A protein has these predicted regions:
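Bacterial N-terminal signal peptides that target proteins for export
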Residues: 1-10
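N-terminal module-boundary/linker segments of secreted carbohydrate-active enzymes
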Residues: 25-65
Length: 271
């Protein structure tokens, strides 16, 4: 009887500890990009962005599907280096006048020269897949998240951080990355896009759906689509559920990923 009582008490204590840690997880301070959400964005990062023909391009298609009356307003650009951290990018140079975004292509593949001046409403930044939690690289993440956020604001744009996902065979990365990005977002008054948490959610909901390329790091087409849905939801504040842009995926997969993305964003922001 005493042994049974001791086991029950231990289980209760463990439950309290687990619950406490779940509640103690850092919460984001910035939970919206504002009523005038960014319609043009520069994505600065690495191959996690450019896999599968580029997540930012898929985001443009999703935004245009949601707001067909003003398609021309939505434009996203990538500045990516394979394997790079934020410290590999020269943010000041990327945002120089007359540089990136000076022209783009419309849906008919015509070159469009954009109005001179500020080319983007927001800059979405992602560090290398391990950098925010790597013992030798995490300090650089904090330093450049701060430095680059200041540069972005100095150019009249909004800084946004993109929370990357855990490797397929290292799910324990999820919580550490979520914490690192949330802390950095809070320190710099920046919105954080919780893509990594959405990956973890889908892996629990439907483990057989492969979100990864064979290297277990980069996204499969389904992974890129999920990241697109999360980014759409975070930046616009609008649900991706029912959006007609599917990236060629089958209907059940699209429905699952759209809903998982929206649920993740609402839960992370506490909405």
């Amino acid at each position: 009887m005493m042994r049974l009582f001791a086991r029950v008490m231990l289980a209760m204590c463990l439950a309290v500890v687990v619950g406490f840690h779940a509640q103690a997880q850092t919460k984001p301070k910035v939970t919206t990009s504002g009523p005038d959400f960014p319609k043009t964005a520069l994505f600065v990062g690495n191959s996690f962005f450019y896999y599968n023909n580029g997540m930012p391009g898929h985001l443009s298609f999703m935004e245009r599907a949601a707001y067909p009356e003003n398609k021309a307003a939505y434009r996203n650009t990538m500045a990516t280096i394979g394997g790079s951290g934020l410290d590999w990018h020269d943010m000041e140079n990327l945002l120089r006048a007359g540089g990136l975004g000076a022209y783009s292509f419309d849906e008919q593949n015509n070159v469009v020269f954009n109005k001179p001046g500020r080319q983007y409403d927001a800059v979405v930044m992602m560090d290398c897949s391990q950098c925010p939690i790597h013992p030798q690289l995490k300090d650089a993440f904090a330093t450049f998240a701060r430095k680059d956020s200041e540069i972005v604001r100095a150019h009249g744009m909004r800084p946004v951080l993109f929370m990357s996902w855990a490797y397929a065979d290292k799910p324990e990365m999820t919580e550490a990355l979520a914490e690192a990005y949330t802390i950095a977002g809070n320190a710099n008054d920046a919105l954080v896009i919780p893509a990594g948490l959405a990956f973890a959610r889908v892996r629990k909901l439907q483990p057989e759906l492969n979100l990864y390329a064979p290297d277990k790091r980069h996204p499969s087409p389904a992974g890129t689509y999920l990241a697109t849905c999360v980014t759409f939801a975070a930046l616009t504040g609008r649900s991706p559920v029912g959006n007609s842009y599917t990236m060629g995926l089958d209907a059940p997969t699209v429905e699952l990923l759209q809903k998982a993305a929206w649920d993740t964003v609402q839960e992370y922001y506490g909405l």
